[in-house]
Amino acid sequence: MFSIRIATVVLAASALLAAASPITNTETPVNQCGSGSIQCCESVQSASAAQAAGILGPLDILTNLQGLVASHCSPLAAVGVSGTSCSSQTVCCKDVSKSGLVNLGCSPINLNL
């Protein structure tokens, strides 16, 4: 009987210690842009959309892409600085082509600017 009580106390103590252990947050905050660059773009659409094909075709960019294509973009270099804003779609793009005219491999992000 005594051994059952000891086992119960040890089990309860172990559960409390596990619950009290610090947990490290490994999630990347939404406003960070991994290996790409943060851009403010006038237009963001699926690479398979007809509008994207119309933009990519004349620029000799492959039209069998997947993901999002952003166009008419400008970099947001100083995120969080007073006066920095984007009235269009903020995206994180891995490939900035044609001086921001077309950006490939984009993901929408929310910077709360």
UniProtKB/Swiss-Prot annotation:
Keywords associated with the record: Cell wall, Disulfide bond, Secreted, Signal
Mutant lacking the gene: phenotype: Leads to retarded growth and displays denser aerial mycelia. Slows down primordia formation, leading to fewer primordia and subsequently fewer fruiting bodies.
Localization recorded for this chain is:
Secreted; Secreted, Cell wall
Locate the transmembrane regions by residue number. Answer: none
Q: Which InterPro entries match?
A: Hydrophobin
Predominant location of this chain? secreted
> What intrachain disulfides are recorded?
33-92, 40-86, 41-73, 93-106
Citing just one GO molecular function, the answer is:
structural constituent of cell wall
Q: Which GO terms describe its cellular component?
A: extracellular region; fungal-type cell wall
Signal sequence residues:
1-20
Q: Which family does it belong to?
A: Belongs to the fungal hydrophobin family.
- Give the record's subunit note: Self-assembles to form functional amyloid fibrils called rodlets. Self-assembly into fibrillar rodlets occurs spontaneously at hydrophobic:hydrophilic interfaces and the rodlets further associate laterally to form amphipathic monolayers.
Function recorded in the entry: Aerial growth, conidiation, and dispersal of filamentous fungi in the environment rely upon a capability of their secreting small amphipathic proteins called hydrophobins (HPBs) with low sequence identity. Class I can self-assemble into an outermost layer of rodlet bundles on aerial cell surfaces, conferring cellular hydrophobicity that supports fungal growth, development and dispersal; whereas Class II form highly ordered films at water-air interfaces through intermolecular interactions but contribute nothing to the rodlet structure.
Write down what this protein is called.
Fruiting body-specific class I hydrophobin fbh1
Q: Which organism is it from?
A: Pleurotus ostreatus (strain PC15) (Oyster mushroom)
Gene that specifies this protein: fbh1
